[in-house]
Swiss-Prot record:
Function: Binds directly to 23S rRNA. The L1 stalk is quite mobile in the ribosome, and is involved in E site tRNA release.
Entries under SUPFAM superfamilies matching the protein: Ribosomal protein L1 (SSF56808)
Annotated Gene Ontology cellular component terms: large ribosomal subunit
GO biological process, one term: regulation of translation
Highest taxon of the lineage: Bacteria
Keywords: Repressor, Ribonucleoprotein, Ribosomal protein, RNA-binding, rRNA-binding, Translation regulation, tRNA-binding
Subunit structure: Part of the 50S ribosomal subunit.
Lineage of origin: Bacteria, Bacillati, Bacillota, Clostridia, Peptostreptococcales
Database matches in InterPro entries: Ribosom_uL1_bac-type, Ribosomal_uL1, Ribosomal_uL1-like, Ribosomal_uL1/biogenesis, Ribosomal_uL1_3-a/b-sand, Ribosomal_uL1_CS
Family (UniProt): Belongs to the universal ribosomal protein uL1 family.
Protein name listed in UniProt: Large ribosomal subunit protein uL1
GO MF: rRNA binding; structural constituent of ribosome; tRNA binding
């Protein structure tokens, strides 16, 4: 494995691996340790005290971050008729039906970041389950991406709506914004995300819900947050 660069090693010295920081301190450090030549993304990784193997302990949803993510999101919408026109007016990047299914299947085309569909188009979208599912792109009612209100869906996504869901190790991974953001913007995005995740706690979850929280920039070290201080 290649050694990390000099800048990374210098950044690492700023972080006390034995310490659990409060959110403001952690995000300040994430900004300081973002030393790459590009504008790194600051991410949150939240381990929950649930078991994703059980249906009644799933944690999944979406939340609009007040300051967005800093990323330009490309939206594909499956809709027809007046709903297709609505999606185009709202600013969707691609709108269609069977022809988009054929393009994805035939050309392995994935030049989009989010897929939205009206409920009546899910039969069409279902044919893409095997390719969209593993990429986390399958529309889902819980995340607001299966809906007839396409104007709201597209506007929220463009404004900074992010999805969160458990991976196999019961961790949620969500972008909080860019390292160039003001510290206050990243903190507000973080608190908005945490609030949504806490509210999504399954009734079947027992014991400590927020097990561990780490923030990091794309190329930077992980900075641990004290899960007992996050909502202070």
């Amino acid at each position: 494995m290649a050694k990390k660069g000099k800048k990374y090693q210098e950044a690492l010295k700023l972080v006390d691996k034995t310490n659990l920081y409060d959110p403001k301190e952690a995000i300040e450090l994430a900004k300081k340790t973002a030393t790459a030549k590009f504008d790194e993304t600051v991410e949150a990784h939240i381990k929950l005290g649930v078991d994703s193997r059980h249906a009644d302990q799933q944690v999944r949803g979406a939340v609009v971050l007040p300051h967005g993510t800093g990323k330009t999101v490309r939206i594909l919408v499956f809709a027809k008729g007046e709903k297709a026109i609505e999606a185009e007016k709202a600013g969707a990047d691609y709108v269609g039906g069977d022809e988009l299914v054929a393009k994805i299947q035939g050309e392995n085309w994935f030049e989009f970041d989010v897929v939205v569909a009206t409920p009546d188009m899910m039969g069409v979208v279902g044919r893409l389950g095997r390719v969209l599912g593993p990429k986390g792109l399958m529309p889902n009612p819980k995340s607001g991406t299966v809906t007839f209100d396409l104007t709201k869906a597209v506007n929220e996504i463009k404004a900074g709506k992010v999805e969160y869901r458990l991976d196999k190790t019961n961790i949620i991974h969500v972008p909080l914004g860019k390292a160039s953001f003001e510290e206050t913007q990243l903190v507000e995005n973080f608190r908005t995300l945490l609030d949504a995740v806490v509210k999504a706690k399954p009734a079947a979850a027992k014991g400590q819900y927020l097990k561990s929280i780490t923030v990091t920039s794309t190329m930077g070290p992980g900075i641990k947050i004290n899960p007992l201080k996050v909502m202070e």
